[in-house]
Amino acid sequence: MQTPSLELKGSSFTLSVLHINSNDMAVIAAELDAKLAIAPQFFLGAPLVVNLSAIQATDFDILGLKEILTNRQLIIVGITSACPELTKQAKSIGLATVKTGKEATSQPQMPKTTKIVKQNVRSGQQIYAKNADLIIVGAVGNGAEVIADGSIHIYGTLRGKAMAGAGGDRHAVIMAQKIEAELVSIAGQYWLTENLQQNGAALSGCIRLEGESLTVESLPL
């Protein structure tokens, strides 16, 4: 029997959702550039769904938004929570309408494996633990990036960037023996160096997400 040349099957994927809260394209572009500068390689080529629930103006420039994203090598696959007029405009430029439902609000799949790196992560290096927790037995230097869909445990000093819950896991944590990070992020919520200093993160600590805000808890050395 001849194998069919194509098959249509249902599946699920983790997509980042970009919430738009302004009609001003210049403001959107500037804030997007600021976020991309934090971890450019992590966001490069990332597929996005744009949430327009906060936009009521029917003259919102969806085409302009699409150009802003594509010019920065981000891929907009569709929109969600838009008013009927904006939904119509989006369809006219080839964007899908993504409906929210039980499948969209369900918890991300919890990582089932652990990736262990038994060495220092140096400037310019990026370690990504896909669908896994990440353990670093060593330090993470300035300019280095460690990313995990699950939690990140660092048995050393964190000086670079650590991004846990990259697949949307809001229960992920970041733990390190000493935190001097350039950036920490859990499920898209992030702190920069100044935020860490303001919240007293310096020695051994555990960073987690509570609601929409990060918190840090000191751990015994």
Curated annotation (Swiss-Prot):
<comment type="function">
    <text>Cell division inhibitor that blocks the formation of polar Z ring septums. Rapidly oscillates between the poles of the cell to destabilize FtsZ filaments that have formed before they mature into polar Z rings. Prevents FtsZ polymerization.</text>
</comment>
<comment type="similarity">
    <text>Belongs to the MinC family.</text>
</comment>
<dbReference type="GO" id="GO:0000902">
    <property type="term" value="P:cell morphogenesis"/>
</dbReference>
<dbReference type="GO" id="GO:0051302">
    <property type="term" value="P:regulation of cell division"/>
</dbReference>
<keyword id="KW-0131">Cell cycle</keyword>
<keyword id="KW-0132">Cell division</keyword>
<dbReference type="InterPro" id="IPR013033">
    <property type="entry name" value="MinC"/>
</dbReference>
<dbReference type="GO" id="GO:0000917">
    <property type="term" value="P:division septum assembly"/>
</dbReference>
<dbReference type="Pfam" id="PF03775">
    <property type="entry name" value="MinC_C"/>
</dbReference>
<protein>
    <recommendedName>
        <fullName>Probable septum site-determining protein MinC</fullName>
    </recommendedName>
</protein>
<keyword id="KW-0717">Septation</keyword>
<dbReference type="InterPro" id="IPR016098">
    <property type="entry name" value="CAP/MinC_C"/>
</dbReference>
<dbReference type="InterPro" id="IPR007874">
    <property type="entry name" value="MinC_N"/>
</dbReference>
<comment type="subunit">
    <text>Interacts with MinD and FtsZ.</text>
</comment>
<dbReference type="InterPro" id="IPR005526">
    <property type="entry name" value="Septum_form_inhib_MinC_C"/>
</dbReference>
<dbReference type="InterPro" id="IPR036145">
    <property type="entry name" value="MinC_C_sf"/>
</dbReference>
<dbReference type="GO" id="GO:1901891">
    <property type="term" value="P:regulation of cell septum assembly"/>
</dbReference>
<dbReference type="Pfam" id="PF05209">
    <property type="entry name" value="MinC_N"/>
</dbReference>
